[in-house]
Amino acid sequence: MQIFKRISMMIGLLLLTATMAFADAKTHKIAFHVDESDPKVMNMALNNVQNVSNYYAGKGEKVIIELVAYGPGLNMFVKGKSPVEDRISVMSMSVDGLTFSACGNTHRKMSEKAGKDVALIDGVGMAPSGVVRLVELQEQGYAYVRP
C-alpha cells in the first residue's frame, strides 16, 4: 500500500511540475507592419518573422505573430502580383502562430480601381482596417515592429 501512495505522490509532483513549467512559459505576441510596395521591405519583414519564430521556437517558447499590410504594402498579398507570394504561401503553412492580415479598406479601393475583386494569396485574412487592426493588436499587448 505504501508503494501506491509513493507512486501517486510522484505522479502528482510530476503533473504539478509540468503544469508550473507550462504556466511559466511566456507567449510572445508581435505585430509586423508593412505599408510599402518595396520587395526589399517585404522580404525584410518576412525575414524578421522567420527569425523571431525560429528564435523563440529554439527556446521552447510560444510566439504569436500577425503581419498586417495596408496601402501600397497590400501588394505583398495580391495573388499573381506579390514578389513574395511563394514565401507567404510556404510560411503560412510552416510557421506556427503566424497570421497574415490584409487591410479591407485598401483591398476595397484596389478592387474598385481594378473593376474586379483583387484576389489575395491563399492563407491571407482580411481585417476591416489595417491601421485599426494594428491599434487593436497593440492594445492586446503585441509588440510593434515596422521593418
Regions found by a protein language model. Name each.
Residues 31-33, 66-69, 99-102, 145-146:
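Structural recognition of the beta-strand scaffold that forms the well-ordered cores
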Residues 1-11:
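Bacterial N-terminal signal peptides that target proteins for export
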Residues 25, 58-63, 95:
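Short helix-terminating capping/connector loops at secondary-structure junctions
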Residues 33-60:
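N-terminal targeting signals for Sec/Tat export/insertion, comprising classic cleavable signal peptides
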Residues 10-19:
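Bacterial N-terminal signal peptides
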Residues 24-37, 68-72:
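Acidic/histidine-rich, surface-exposed loop or edge segments in extracytoplasmic proteins
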Residues 78-147:
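A cross-taxonomic marker for long C-terminal extensions/tails that follow the last structured domain
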Residues 63-77, 106:
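Acidic helix-start/capping segments at beta-turn-to-alpha-helix junctions
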